[in-house]
Amino acid sequence: MGAVGVLALSALCPSALVAQDSATPYEAIDDAGARTAIRTLIADAAAKGLPTSPLVTKVREGIAKRATPDRIRNATSLLVDRLEKASSALAPTRSSEELAAGADALQAGVPASTLRDMRKLWPGKPLTVPLGVLSEMVASGVSQSVATRRVRELLIKGASSAQFASMGTEVRNDIASGLAPNAAMELRSKGVISLLNYQAQVLNGMQPASPAPIRPGTPPKK
């Protein structure tokens, strides 16, 4: 199901949400107890207003990887916990994609307090992409403190989701080319901030010099 379809379905009611799991191949789980437990976990999550599509995906992944029934059940239970924490931290959002991104960030080791802070900074805008980039940066080797600080600065500056996504791609490419993860994050985030500052000055009627191009290997300006 596409993102728009999931959002439309989740807006209906918990009973509509639980219908998302109807196509899940539960019968491929040969342990009846685990099968029942997983169904119950997903039904309970739906009753709480949590998105079930990430849970269904987790079950499918476990089946595809031939994980044991207990491992699939445990993984599903842990994801329910993360979705609950993300829902609390990112309130009042009910976006399936945003809550899933929050759950991924928690799994990457980002504390719930960071999610709450990001929501305060962007109270009316979706955090799906910024959260996804934060998770990817930490997973790519950027220290949590550097990744969090830089993402926070970009939120304050008003970076767009497209700018977040582009920066994330550039950081990954820089790391693949041999640049240290923290240096890549510092370099690329400063490039975005430089552009945002330039755009703000133009909007205010100033005539600033064009921002210098940022290239891999260029030492970040202090």
PLM feature spans:
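Bacterial N-terminal signal peptides
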Residues: 2-14
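General marker for long, soluble alpha-helical cores
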Residues: 18-222
